Amino acid sequence: KEGYIVDYHTGCKYTCAKLGDNDYCVRECRLRYYQSAHGYCYAFACWCTHLYEQAVVWPLPNKRCK
C-alpha cells in the first residue's frame, strides 16, 4: 500500500518543500508506520510507500483538512 501521510487531528497531509527524495518524508513515514516504509515528496506532500494494508493514509473518512 502507499499514500500520503496524514495528521489525524487536522485531516491534512504532511507538507514538504523539496520534491523527490526527501529525508524529512522518509523519517516521518518510518516514524508513523514502520522502518521498512519509504517516503518522498510528491506534489508538495509526503508520499509513503511499502505500507501495510491497514495503514491509514489521506484522505481520512469524514475529516477534511482545515
UniProtKB/Swiss-Prot annotation:
GO MF annotations for this entry? sodium channel inhibitor activity; toxin activity
GO cellular component terms attached to this protein's record: extracellular region
Broad class of where this protein is predominantly found? secreted
Locate the coiled-coil region(s) and give their ranges.
none
Provide the GO biological process annotations.
defense response
Q: Which UniProt keywords apply?
A: Amidation, Disulfide bond, Ion channel impairing toxin, Neurotoxin, Secreted, Toxin, Voltage-gated sodium channel impairing toxin
Q: Which Gene3D superfamilies match?
A: Knottin, scorpion toxin-like
Query: Any idea which residues bear Lysine amide here?
Result: K66
Cysteines engaged in disulfide bonds, as pairs: C12-C65, C16-C41, C25-C46, C29-C48
Residue span(s) of domain LCN-type CS-alpha/beta: 1-66
State the SUPFAM superfamilies in the record: Scorpion toxin-like
Intracellular or extracellular location(s): Secreted
Question: Highest taxon of the source?
Answer: Eukaryota
Its tissue distribution reads: Expressed by the venom gland.
Any notes on this protein's domains?
Answer: Has the structural arrangement of an alpha-helix connected to antiparallel beta-sheets by disulfide bonds (CS-alpha/beta).
Could you share any additional remarks the record makes about this protein? Negative results: does not modify the currents of the human voltage-gated sodium channels Nav1.1/SCN1A, Nav1.2/SCN2A, Nav1.3/SCN3A and Nav1.7/SCN9A.
What protein family is recorded?
Belongs to the long (4 C-C) scorpion toxin superfamily. Sodium channel inhibitor family. Beta subfamily.
Please describe what this protein does.
Answer: Beta toxins bind voltage-independently at site-4 of sodium channels and shift the voltage of activation toward more negative potentials thereby affecting sodium channel activation and promoting spontaneous and repetitive firing. Is active on the human voltage-gated sodium channels Nav1.4/SCN4A, Nav1.5/SCN5A and Nav1.6/SCN8A when tested at 200 nM. In vivo, is toxic to mice when intraperitoneally injected.
Query: What protein name applies here?
Result: Beta-toxin Cbo4
